[in-house]
Amino acid sequence: MALDEKFQLEVIHLLLQFLNDYGYDESLKALEKETGLVSETEDVKRLKQAVLQGDWITAEAAFSIMQLRDESKRKEAQFLLQKQRCLELARSGAICEAIYVLQNFESTDFNKEKERLVSIILESNNKSNNELITKNGYGNTRLDLLNQLSEYISPEILLPKRRLEHLLQQAKDYQVSSQVYHNVLKNFSFLSDYKADPSELPTKEYHVFHDHSDEVWQISYSHNGRYLASASKDKTAIIFDVVNLKRVFRLIGHIDTVAYIRWSPDDRYLLSCSCDKSVILWDAFTGEKLRDYKHGFSVSCCCWLPDGLSFITGSPDCHITHWSLNGEILYKWEDVNIYDMALTSDGTKLYIVGFEQLINAEDKHIAIYSVETRECIKKISLQSKVTSICLSKDSKYALTNLEPHTTFLWDLEENRIVRQYMGHKLGNFLIGSCFGGKDDTFVLSGSEDDKIRIWHRESGKLLATLSGHVKCVNYVAYNPVDPYQFASAGDDNTVRIWSNKDNPRRQ
C-alpha cells in the first residue's frame, strides 16, 4: 500500500523521534540529512533546554511563540510553567519570592489554585518543604513539566512523548481486542497479524466431583486458585483441591441448605450462609467450625471486607448486616429481599441486588452503599428481578442476571448497561454469572437448560455452549489464578471443573 506524501512525512517524524529517544544518533543524523527534516526545531530545543535547566524567563519566551493545539489553553500551560518555578523556589526556601511569582501571574482563572499553593507554601516554611509540597500533589520534576507542555503544543511542532510506541500499543490493543477467543497473550509480533483460536477457551470437562448428595447451589475459588469451596442443599459445604482433584474437607455444622460460601482475603477462613438462619466461620486449614453468627431469618449471601476482620451478610428478611469476626454487629441496613451482594476491591462500595413484593407493585433494584458512611449512594430501579451480581477485577463493571434470559454488563462509573448476553434460560432459580479469562475478556453463566454459556465480553458474541450437567446449572466461578480453568455447580449434585485441555486420568 503506497503512502501519500503527508503520511510519509508523519512516519518520518515518528522515526526521527524514536531514533532520538533511544540514542541512535548516527542513524538520526543520516535520516535528517537524507530527508531534510529534523527531529526537533531550534525553538523546541531552546524550550526543552530552558525548562530542564530551570531558566524560566527563557522558557516563557520560548513557549510564547509555540503553536498550540488549542490557543485558548495558552494561559493554562503558562500557569504550569509559573507553578513549577514557584514550587522550586519554595523548596529552596525562597518563600517570599515563590509567592511573588504566583501573585504576579496575570490571569485570574487560577485564583483558587494560587490560594491553595500559597497556603501550602506558607505551611511548608515551618515544616519539611519537600515533603509537604510533594504530599499535596506538587512533586513534579522538570521532565514531568516538559511532558505536560507537550500535550499543549501542536504535534506538528512537538510530538507527544514516545508517540510511535503509543501508536504501536494502540495497534496491539486493537488486534488483541478484535480476537474474540483471546485469553492469554502469547507470541505477539508486529510482523504478523495476531490470531487467537478456540483452544484458548476452557470448554473441556476436566473433572467431576460427585461428593454432594443434593443440589449444589454455589461455589467459590480461594484467592490462590488452589481450592474450591461448594455450598449444597445437602446441608454441607466441601473444600476441594482443584490441583490434585480431591476432596479436602467436608464442613458439617448446618442443619439446613448451605446457600452461599466465601473465602477470606487471606484464604485462612471460610464463611458459609445457610437457610438455618446462621452463618458459620470455618478454619480452611483444618475444616474446624470456629463460630456461629445467628440471624433472624435465612442468610442468602455474604462478602468479606478487604482487611479480613469483618464481613457483611444479606438476608431475605431485607436486612444487610455488618459483622466483626468476634460476632459484634457493627451496623445494620434495611433494604429488600437480598439475593446477592458484591464489594468493590477497595472495600468502599457495597452492591446489593434484591426484590420485594409491595402491596400494589414490586420493588426490584440494585442498591449501592458506602461502607464508610453507610449511606445509600444510589438505587437503580429495574424492570425484571435480578438474581445475582458479580464485579470485574477492577470493580469498574458488573454482571447481573435478570429474568427471564438476559445477563447485563453494567458500567459502574456511569451506572448504565453497556452490553447484554442472551441465549440462556433464567427464571425459577438463582443463577450466577461471572467474568472469565486473564483480563475478564469472557462472560460465563449457568442456565436452567442444564448448559453453560461463554460469551465474548466486548462484542457479546456467544462463543461456546457447554453440556455436561444433566440438571440446572446454578453457578459458575472462574479460577482467579489459572486463566484456563473454571468450575460449575448444578442441581445434579455435581461440581465440575472445566479446562482447555483434556484430563489424562479420564482417557
From Swiss-Prot:
Belongs to the GID7 family. Gene3D superfamilies: YVTN repeat-like/Quinoprotein amine dehydrogenase. Residues 40-97 form the CTLH domain. The gene is gid7. It comes from Schizosaccharomyces pombe (strain 972 / ATCC 24843) (Fission yeast). Its main location: cytoplasm. Keywords: Cytoplasm, Nucleus, Repeat, WD repeat. Transmembrane segments: none annotated. Identified in the GID/CTLH complex. In the absence of stress, the complex exists as an inactive anticipatory complex (GID(Ant)), composed of Gid1, the E3 ubiquitin-ligase Gid2, Gid5, Gid8, and the RING-like subunit Gid9, awaiting a substrate receptor to form the active E3 ligase complex. When cells are shifted to glucose-containing medium, the substrate receptor Gid4 is induced and becomes part of the complex, named GID(SR4). Additionally, Gid7 transforms the GID(SR4) E3 ligase core into a higher-order supramolecular assembly (Chelator-GID(SR4)). One of its GO terms (cellular component) is nucleus. PROSITE patterns: CTLH, LISH, WD_REPEATS_1, WD_REPEATS_2, WD_REPEATS_REGION. It holds the Pfam family WD40. This is GID complex subunit 7.
